[in-house]
Amino acid sequence: IIPVMLRPFQILSVKGTSRSTAKNLWRQKMYPYINLFGLSIPSYGLMMALAFIAAILIAYHRTNKAGLDTDALLTLAIITLTCGLAGSYLLYIFVTYSLSEIWGSIVDGSFSVFKSGGLVFYGGLIVGVLSGWIYLHAKKASFYEYAAVIVPAIPLAHAIGRIGCFLAGCCYGRIVDTPISVYYRNPIGGAPVGVPVFPIQLVESACNILVFVILLIYTRKRLKAGSVLFLYALLYGIERFCLEYFRADEIRGIFLGLSTSQWISIAMIIFGIVGFVLARRRENRINKTRNDEHSQTEPLSDNIHSENSPSDVG
């Protein structure tokens, strides 16, 4: 399965290759479906499943290492995944159709706008985080502690998911003739067929891997640092705002020259900066309190030890 899925990437580096040869090499089928054991499996759905499994494994390991309840993590994963998918789909509906079209389909009972398929990552991220906060608050568990162990897994899962987008031909880039441009032959994902398309999905996947590594390094000595949530919001907000300029799929929802995702990215950046500063202050106060308590107990233990030790004989 891995060689089949990676075949579209076989000439990511075309340095020293003629442009015509590069074009011919890149005219490969992008595998919107992968045949396994006689079954035709959508590559997008397969990569989404792999992304979820990878995120669960990383989060489970980190949760166990932090001494948190792993059973609560599994319940949390199911809740956030379900709510996240719903939020991702709803945001797709709102950026694809006007409010009048949505309301009209509800009034006439056809619900036609809800019969189309599509997902927008930001919708899933926002609703998923909110649903996780509600669950942990009801359970009287620390949202920040669980966020610290779970959040680094999000960009990893997102990176794998974007490979699924690349294989399926959705979330595609602008039509531009570059050495790494790809040529889609199957219109099922919505990408234009037979023209050079910038592989923005792979670029975003690489950026998400970088964010994943940064978050792992940041939490190496701060395993329960809730500020990692805001650091992720800041990093991904900047990443997504910039990469949106290279996107060409129609689900953009342009307003005042910026896409819906860019407006959300601006909010994410502000949220990340403010939240990170406040969270770091909170963590510093907690660490200071713990250090003060530790320093107060040390003299007490020394006094007890000296009282119990035999006196010097002169």
Where are these regions (language model features)?
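Short, Lys/Arg-enriched N-terminal segments with co-localized hydrophobic residues
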Residues: 1-3, 10-29
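Compositionally biased, low-complexity intrinsically disordered regions
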Residues: 6-9, 308
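A feature for loop-to-transmembrane-helix boundaries and adjacent hydrophobic helices
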Residues: 26-314
